[in-house]
């Protein structure tokens, strides 16, 4: 049996409706769980970027990426191990404002985790933390001890450490688009 590990897929595409559904369907048909999914514009005008995190074997990720590459409107798909990328997630926490009145405990927690206060309202405080999943989870566990109203974490955003492969491909796509 192949060992599972975490891979980050980066898919470059044109902005077409229905593509997200096709990509998700392609993955879920294989009974693969999507850990996180983020879609945004890329550095190239008119090109969108999907960042998908999967925990599977390398053999399976190669097949998934090959299938995604065959989709109409997909320009190119890549996969990376965690050591090949720089990645972060953002988390928001809504905690009771009363927690702020109990001395400096909450302030110390926020500083310890390199988080920041985004908003203070009459009933709650919104705290933001950017980091890896284990870091945002650690802050969540601290806030659970003092009370938390709400928690949400984004999907992964990632940039590839090695530039050559991606830059060459994007340059070839840009040249191809200009020729058409």
Predicted regions mapped to residue ranges:
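Long, contiguous binding/interaction regions
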Residues: 1-49, 53-180
């Amino acid at each position: 049996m192949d060992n599972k590990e975490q891979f980050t897929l980066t898919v470059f595409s044109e902005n077409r409706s229905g593509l997200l559904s096709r990509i998700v369907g392609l993955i879920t048909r294989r009974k693969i769980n999507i850990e996180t999914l983020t879609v945004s514009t890329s550095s190239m005008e008119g090109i969108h970027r999907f960042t998908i995190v999967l925990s599977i074997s390398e053999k399976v990720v190669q097949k998934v990426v090959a299938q995604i590459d065959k989709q109409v409107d997909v320009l190119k798909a890549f996969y990376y191990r965690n050591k090949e990328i720089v990645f972060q997630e953002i988390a928001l926490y809504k905690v009771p404002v009363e927690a702020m009145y109990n001395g400096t405990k909450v302030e110390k927690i926020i500083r310890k985790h390199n988080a920041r206060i985004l908003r203070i309202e009459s009933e709650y405080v919104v705290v933001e933390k950017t980091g890896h999943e284990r870091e945002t989870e650690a802050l969540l566990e601290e806030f659970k001890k003092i009370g938390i109203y709400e928690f949400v974490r984004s999907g992964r955003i990632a940039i590839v450490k090695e530039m050559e492969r991606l830059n060459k491909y994007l340059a070839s796509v840009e040249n191809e688009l200009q020729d058409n």
